[in-house]
Structure formats: structure tokens, C-alpha cells
Design a protein with these regions (language model features):
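A Zn2+-metalloprotease active-site environment signal
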Residues: 1-259
Length: 259
């Protein structure tokens, strides 16, 4: 996932990404990959890198990729990684990069919960939530429209822009509407695979007990009660109604000795 701008093609993609981020053009998938890789590096740097447990990584990828196949952009090459950090969090970067901390994994009780958590992050990618922030915000972290345009011609400026965008996204998070949509669709994607959608409600209730209702992950996030209500509404709208599997024993077996 290293960010490299060498070569004529790569430089052209960076120029295109910078222009697209200025809001002048839609972001192509090649440009999305450049942005996603750069933001992914910021996540890795902030959260102590990848947790070196290949068996655990394979398991998370198996679950995540199964869920991603049911999402709105199933052809993206999704990559799932466990972060070596004890905080309770997960992140998504454009073009298919999904991260979950080992601290969050410790809170998960069954595979259905894991599938829904990954589905939440997959939704941010499939619905282009981060890209929407990049395109619609005209002064991300104080960067002007001219600065956005300059990123298309100078890889150094592009990297500085990515640094600023990553700081905003990692410190503040996405807005409430996008988070609620990710809860609703993430559960639906997991249910399509055959997981019990109610498992995610139990997961959110457990986090509410652990953190308190007003302690959202970021100040822009809805509280847990709002997220639970939105998730339950989404579950009621599933057609046909889904029950599905929890697979608690399988999760316990796969995580044994890994965390």
C-alpha cells in the first residue's frame, strides 16, 4: 500500500486525483485507489501498524470479503487488516481498505457481529462516503480550492493534502447521516450472506453499556441509542425477514490465542 508517485502514469493519476478532489471532475477508480492508499498509510501510522497475526488476518478477510460481495460495489478488491491498537475502532479508506483494531475484536462475541461491523465499513466504501467529503468540502482543514487544485500538479502538495484530510477524518469522523446509513446497510449486507442481523443490535447495546450513550466514537457520530433505533428499523425493512446464524463458536475458535 505504499504511496508512490514515480513514473508518468502514476504522476498522471495523482494529477487526476488532485483535480478530482477539487470538485471539478468525478473521481475515477484509479484516482480513488491513489487517495485510498495514501489515507490507508495514515491509518497504519496512527494506529501502530498491522497486527502481526496472519491466521487472524485471513479469518477477517474471509468474513469481510464474503460480506463485500453483497455490497453495491462488489468488484472492488477489498483488503481487511487488523490494527495493533487496543482502542475500540474501525476505519475505511476509499478503494477497499478496511481496518479493525484488535481492541474492537476483543469486544466481538460472534461472527455475525464481526460481519456487521465489517459491513458498516464496507458501506463507507461502497457508498463513497469519504470521497463525498473530499469533493464537497471546500476548506478541508483550512485548505483552499487553490490548494486542492495544486495537488493535481505537485505530489508533495498532494501528500500534504492527504495528511490534512486524514487528520480531519480520523479525529472527527463522518457525519451522522453517513454513519446511520452504514449501520443500516452494513447489517443488510451481512444478512444477505446469512448472518443474524440482530447480532449487531446486541453489539451496539454492549458498546453503549461500556462507553455510555453520549460517548460516540467521534463528536460528529450519532449516539448509540440513535444507532440502535436506526439499525432496528433497517432490520424490520429487510425482505424477506432474516434470522440467520451467529456462529459464536467459530469466532471463538478462530480468535483463540490470537488476541
Amino acid at each position: 500500500m505504499a504511496y508512490q508517485a514515480g513514473g508518468e502514469r502514476a504522476a498522471g493519476v495523482v494529477r487526476g486525483a488532485g483535480t478530482a478532489m477539487s470538485g471539478l471532475l468525478p473521481i475515477s477508480y484509479d484516482e480513488e485507489k491513489v487517495i485510498g492508499e495514501a489515507l490507508a498509510l495514515q491509518v497504519l501510522a496512527r494506529y501502530h501498524g498491522v497486527y502481526d497475526k496472519p491466521q487472524l488476518t485471513r479469518y477477517v478477510n474471509l468474513v469481510g470479503r464474503a460480506v463485500a460481495l453483497t455490497a453495491d460495489r462488489p468488484t472492488i478488491a477489498y483488503h481487511f487488516a487488523v490494527l495493533n491498537h487496543d482502542s475500540i475502532n474501525a476505519f475505511a479508506a476509499p478503494a477497499g481498505y478496511v481496518f479493525i483494531t484488535k481492541g474492537l475484536l476483543k469486544q466481538i462475541r460472534n461472527e455475525a457481529e464481526l460481519a456487521a461491523v465489517l459491513g458498516h465499513e464496507i458501506t463507507h466504501i461502497s457508498e463513497k462516503h469519504v470521497l463525498a467529503v473530499l469533493q464537497r468540502s471546500k476548506q478541508l482543514a483550512g485548505i483552499s480550492e487553490a490548494g486542492l487544485s495544486a495537488a493535481g500538479h505537485n505530489p508533495v502538495v498532494f501528500k500534504s493534502l492527504i495528511d490534512a484530510v486524514a487528520k480531519k477524518l480520523l479525529d472527527e469522523g463522518l457525519d451522522q447521516g453517513k454513519e446511520l446509513e452504514a449501520d443500516r446497510l452494513g447489517v443488510a449486507f451481512a444478512a444477505r450472506v446469512g448472518y443474524d442481523p440482530q447480532a449487531y443490535v446486541g453489539f451496539l447495546q454492549r458498546l453503549r453499556t461500556l462507553k455510555g450513550d453520549d460517548q460516540a466514537f467521534f463528536k460528529t457520530h450519532p449516539n448509540f441509542s440513535s444507532r440502535i433505533a436506526e439499525t432496528q428499523q433497517g432490520i424490520r425493512a429487510l425482505s424477506p425477514p432474516r434470522q440467520g446464524a451467529l456462529l459464536a463458536d467459530r469466532l471463538t475458535q478462530r480468535l483463540r490465542g490470537q488476541l
